Each structure stands twice: as structure tokens, then as C-alpha cells.
């Protein structure tokens, strides 16, 4: 689910996926893929990198079950955060490949990834917030998301 807050007028936004009761192999595999996608994007973030370079790391819409980038818009995605929930830069295959923006120190944005499970009805979604430093990115979200969290396990 999407967790959204405001603090002194500034917005936050991050996704976490939970399994309730138990996680199947399909759930864990989807989560692992979503985590790999977001980790590769976070590792790419530093001043001078452009948004098309980040978007190019993500799979095409067809690779994860959608017919077009418009249909999949917002699933492999990045957006600035500030006084608004969705600010620039916008990072997606739909617009960044043709209209890249250079990443600069001080930018604050969220990166979101999604991957469908092979069971036909489940999926995993992860979103992390970060600030661009002089040398890379500092993660702002502290709620753990390295592994799929199972609540009320049985």
C-alpha cells in the first residue's frame, strides 16, 4: 500500500508490500524482482545522470504484462517530492526516454517499481524516497523493505 504523509507542508510517498498470513513462492519471487529493479535504479542516481538512463533500466510495459507504456504508466516510475506529491522530475519510459532531465544535488524524489507474480493475481510494489547528494543518493525511507514482510504469520 501507498504511505503518504505531510510534514511542515512537504509531502512523502512510499509503497510497501505485505503478505498476510503467509507468502507463497510466487509472492517472494515478485518481491525479489521489484526489489532488484528499485535497487538498480537507486544505484544509478547521482548528479549528472539523466532520467532516461534510469528509465532505461526498467523493463518495457510488455515485459511485465501490459500492452503499452501508457497502460503501465506509474508502475515503473519516479517523481519529485516537495510541496506537491508528484513534482518534477518525472521518471518513466513513457516520457523520460525522449525528454530526459539531468539529476542534480538536492533533488528529492521517489522511485517506484512493480512486478507481477506468476500466480496470475498477485504483485509486489516498492517505493523508496531519496535525496540526491554530491556523490549519489541518500535513502530517506527508513521503513524496512529489503525482504517481503509477512504480517500475522501462520
Which ranges hold each PLM region?
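Active-site neighborhoods and metal-handling regions in enzymes and metal-associated proteins
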Residues: 1-154
